[in-house]
Amino acid sequence: MSEAIIAKKAELVDVVAEKMKAAASIVVVDARGLTVEQDTVLRRELRGSEVEYKVIKNSILRRAAEKAGLEDLASVFVGPSAVAFSNEDVIAPAKILNNFSKNAEALEIKGGAIEGAVASKEEILALATLPNREGLLXMLLSVLQAPVRNVALAVKAVAESKEDAA
């Protein structure tokens, strides 16, 4: 192999390793068997959530994972692999790929990494069932508002009972 090709591959390994280090979550899938139309729709959905989706050779993924400190992730790089990287939303790639796999049986989630820790297929699927960041914030807000709402209702009830007594 020529030195130019080796240098190009080494550069690609470095780029992928940096993406792995910077990613909030990584999901590895086997997309073998997807039609071109399905793949286009999937890529559009992922792009809409600012998730980068690439098909990369396993040898490059293994070397990049090793360089990024995710050596255990190398076990999922078997057969054709596509990788979804998200730098912002931890849940988005798992949720989109899981929902898409329900309609496209050819898409299979293999595993991934969450906040720099290797995650199994089951952990990625569990992550996909969580609400997104906005949903979690709304849940937190409703939990925080409940005591205040209860106090306000109690004060209102006391005020009404004093009005009725007067």
UniProtKB/Swiss-Prot annotation:
Question: InterPro entries of this UniProt entry?
Answer: Ribosomal_uL10, Ribosomal_uL10-like_sf, Ribosomal_uL10_bac, Ribosomal_uL10_bac_type, Ribosomal_uL10_CS_bac
Keywords, ordered alphabetically: Ribonucleoprotein, Ribosomal protein, RNA-binding, rRNA-binding
The answer, when asked if Ribosomal protein is one of the entry's keywords, is: yes
Question: Which Pfam families would you find in this protein's record?
Answer: Ribosomal_L10
Coiled-coil stretches? none
Which superkingdom, per the lineage?
Answer: Bacteria
Q: One GO BP annotation here? A: translation
Q: What molecular functions are annotated in GO for this chain?
A: large ribosomal subunit rRNA binding; structural constituent of ribosome
Q: Which GO terms describe its cellular component?
A: large ribosomal subunit
What HAMAP family would the database entry show? Ribosomal_uL10 (MF_00362)
Its quaternary organisation is: Part of the ribosomal stalk of the 50S ribosomal subunit. The N-terminus interacts with L11 and the large rRNA to form the base of the stalk. The C-terminus forms an elongated spine to which L12 dimers bind in a sequential fashion forming a multimeric L10(L12)X complex.
Family recorded in the similarity comment: Belongs to the universal ribosomal protein uL10 family.
Q: What job does the chain carry out? A: Forms part of the ribosomal stalk, playing a central role in the interaction of the ribosome with GTP-bound translation factors.
Record-given protein name? Large ribosomal subunit protein uL10
> Organism source for this protein?
Streptococcus pneumoniae serotype 19F (strain G54)
Ranked from the top, the taxonomy reads: Bacteria, Bacillati, Bacillota, Bacilli, Lactobacillales
| Gene giving rise to this polypeptide | rplJ
